[in-house]
Design a protein with these regions (language model features):
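A short glycine-rich, Lys/Arg-flanked "PGG" loop and its adjoining helix->strand segment in the class I
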Residues: 116-128
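Class I SAM-dependent methyltransferase SAM/SAH-binding core
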Residues: 38-40, 44-92
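A short SAM/SAH-binding and catalytic strip from SAM-dependent methyltransferases
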Residues: 101-114
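Conserved alpha-helix/loop element of class I SAM-dependent methyltransferases that forms part
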Residues: 16-36, 46-50
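A short acidic, Gly/Pro-enriched loop at the edge of an enzyme's catalytic core
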Residues: 91-103
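Short alpha-helix
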Residues: 161-177
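Conserved small/polar residues in nucleotide/adenosyl-binding loops
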Residues: 199-201
Length: 201
């Protein structure tokens, strides 16, 4: 792992993932979590301030990047909830089935190499009747914008930690045999080429 991945990328991701419009999407979703939470892509802990300690008993965060995790130290210290980290990607999570009440995924499916396998892992670990909460960015509905997503993604992925701006998030859920109760779609302020924002609560 080079200097960029160790020192520059974690700072850039922490800053980018905490900008106002993205933070507002997190604030809409995360407070709905309850019980034992499995958070995929916990990263620098951007979601931690939005968990309700009266509703959440424990957070199990999954993230393979030790360097971005170090940037969560202050947010972890300020959080009243017990936090455990598993330093792996989301495709193979060493947890028993049916132990989580809620799965939270925010701006992480874009980076997981095998996102469908990761979604199946989430459902394995989720208790019957549990819920998956997510906000993501993905494939733009406008074909002209989606063409640009396809053009920039090879380079964008290299500089943004594997992020794929044009992923078809609803299609990934369909491939994992998951259905939405509700799905809100919108462009948030910023370059549209970075994708449509999707929210499921």
């Amino acid at each position: 792992m080079g200097f960029y991945a160790k020192h520059i990328l974690p700072r850039c991701l922490d800053a980018a993932c905490g900008i106002g419009p993205i933070s507002k999407q997190r604030e809409k979703v995360v407070p709905h979590a309850e019980g034992v939470v499995l958070e995929i892509g916990i990263g620098s802990g951007q979601n931690l301030p939005f968990y309700n300690p009266d509703k959440v008993s424990k957070i199990i965060g999954v993230d393979p990047d030790e360097h971005i995790w170090k940037r969560s130290a202050k947010r972890r210290a300020d959080c009243e909830i017990e936090i455990e980290r598993i330093g792996l990607s989301g495709e193979d999570i060493p947890l028993d089935k049916n132990i989580a009440d809620t799965v939270v995924v925010t701006y992480s499916l874009c980076t997981i190499p095998d996102a469908v396998k990761a979604l199946r892992e989430m459902t394995r670990i989720l208790k019957p009747g549990g819920k998956i909460l997510f906000t993501e960015h993905g494939k733009a509905p406008d074909e002209a914008i989606h063409k640009w997503q396809r053009r920039i993604d090879p380079l964008w992925g290299k500089i943004a930690g594997g992020c794929r701006s044009g992923r078809d998030i609803p299609e990934l859920f369909r491939q994992a045999d998951l259905k939405f109760d509700t799905l809100e779609e919108m462009y948030i302020p910023g370059p549209k080429v970075l994708g449509l924002s999707l929210i499921h609560i």
